[in-house]
């Protein structure tokens, strides 16, 4: 029996090695063209809700590979917005259905990398303002890895069986794209997946490495707007006013106690006041002050507790300060841009870890800590985590910069930074090998 087990193990490893070698050889051939695609996408970013040309580019690539492609998939809450979501389906006999997702949108950031293919793009945002646009969150790397994976799998149809669904999702940066595509029948108009996969560029991992995290990987994200309504007047007669600036200051300090005193130290959470606006002149007490908050959590019950406490604390401080009820603060939670936490299915995560180790080497696959950033990828698991899903981190940093950072403390450009510049060749190579190997393992 022991001898038979060893033989089967050797057969499995040989098969895995064969797949890995075939994928690696194909990626090596395709890499120069994929890097060219990456530079094109990097130089031509589009804002959330305006990804028309980006989506068309990806749709054309998928069609050329034999995918049945549907464009403009998605229904936003605002009926005037057009969704540029796209779905490509490649059927290859009986077997599981695997969905691979990339995001399409870029950010209103002026690029300062100095790269020869740096973005010079300008766009008009929703407020009618001219803004610079940059792929500062790695979505260009995501899309290139996505297209590379599509090429690999279309060329290796003799190595897998099932249905491959590849989706280009708009408006990830606004937390709206996944919800829009699901609302438009992503899992009813198209094959419902048995597994859902995605990757995300990492600004702290060297290019060539993969980071994985079982269970919670990214956080719930809520945006909260608070309007403190007072009664303004002359700064020399504050006793005749209800000063919203003083009250706003008390609210900001009070909010800091929610996480430190109401939430268990074992439950990660963040309440950050990112913006305070009020007043116009030195000696004028304004009528209103506006606060903008970001709230991060993992567990649903922790999220609810924090949001309830923000409302209760803000109203309570105003009441204690003698503000009249008709001028009570207004606390609004933006449900439109709420992003649920991303939970990586532990069993699927471990299966992929073994696949990544076989394809890339164990030294290039590392477990990372969960982060308080957000991603609407978590919506694809559906309620109750019905569909196993995993998003993994793709190292994107030039190893030389990482060494310099570790030796001298020189800051690394973070995601959303104007200086964020992935190292294309090793990042794309690793992304394509990892994602292709993952799909092959699930559909073998």
PLM feature spans:
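Sec-dependent signal peptide recognition
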Residues: 3-10
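Hydrophobic h-region of N-terminal signal peptides that target proteins for export
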Residues: 11-20, 30
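Soluble non-cytosolic domains of exported or imported proteins
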Residues: 28-32, 45-56, 140, 144, ...
């Amino acid at each position: 029996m022991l001898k038979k087990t060893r033989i089967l193990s050797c057969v499995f490893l040989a098969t895995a090695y064969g797949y890995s070698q075939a994928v690696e050889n194909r990626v090596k051939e395709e890499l120069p063209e994929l890097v060219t695609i990456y530079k094109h996408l990097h130089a031509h970013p589009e804002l959330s809700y305006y990804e028309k040309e980006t989506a068309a580019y990806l749709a054309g690539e998928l069609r050329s590979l034999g995918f049945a492609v549907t464009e403009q998939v998605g229904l936003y809450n605002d009926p005037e917005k057009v969704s540029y979501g796209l779905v490509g389906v490649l059927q290859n006999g009986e077997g599981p259905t695997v969905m691979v997702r990339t995001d399409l949108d870029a950010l209103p950031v002026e690029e300062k990398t100095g790269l020869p293919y740096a973005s010079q793009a300008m766009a008009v945002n929703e407020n009618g303002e001219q803004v610079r646009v940059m792929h500062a969150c790695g979505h260009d790397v995501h899309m290139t890895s996505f297209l590379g994976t599509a090429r690999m799998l279309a060329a290796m149809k003799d190595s897998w069986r099932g249905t491959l669904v590849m989706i280009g999702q708009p408006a990830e940066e606004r937390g709206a794209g996944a919800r829009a595509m699901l609302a438009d029948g992503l899992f009813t108009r198209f094959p419902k997946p048995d597994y859902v996969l995605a990757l995300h560029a990492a600004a702290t991992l060297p290019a060539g490495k993969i980071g994985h995290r079982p269970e919670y990987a990214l956080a719930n994200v809520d945006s909260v707007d608070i309007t403190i309504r007072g009664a303004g007047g002359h700064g020399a007669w504050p006793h005749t006013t209800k000063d919203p600036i003083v009250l706003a200051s008390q609210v900001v300090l009070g909010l800091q106690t929610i996480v430190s005193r109401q939430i268990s130290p074992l439950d990660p959470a963040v309440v950050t006041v990112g913006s305070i606006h009020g007043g116009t002149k030195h000696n004028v007490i304004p009528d209103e002050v506006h606060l903008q908050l970001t709230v991060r959590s993992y567990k649903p019950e922790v999220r609810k507790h924090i949001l309830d406490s923000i409302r209760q604390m803000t109203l309570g401080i105003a009441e204690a300060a003698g503000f009249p009820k008709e001028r009570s603060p207004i606390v609004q939670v933006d449900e439109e841009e709420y992003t649920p936490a991303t939970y990586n299915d532990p069993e699927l995560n471990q299966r992929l870890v073994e696949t990544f180790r076989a394809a890339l080497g164990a030294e290039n696959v590392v477990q990372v800590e969960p982060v308080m950033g957000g991603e609407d990828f978590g919506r694809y698991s559906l309620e109750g985590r019905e569909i196993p899903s995993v998003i993994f981190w793709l190292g994107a940093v030039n190893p030389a910069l990482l060494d310099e950072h570790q030796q001298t403390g020189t800051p690394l450009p973070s995601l959303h930074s104007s200086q964020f510049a992935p190292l294309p060749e090793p990042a794309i190579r690793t992304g394509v090998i990892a994602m292709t190997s993952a799909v092959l393992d699930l559909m073998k």
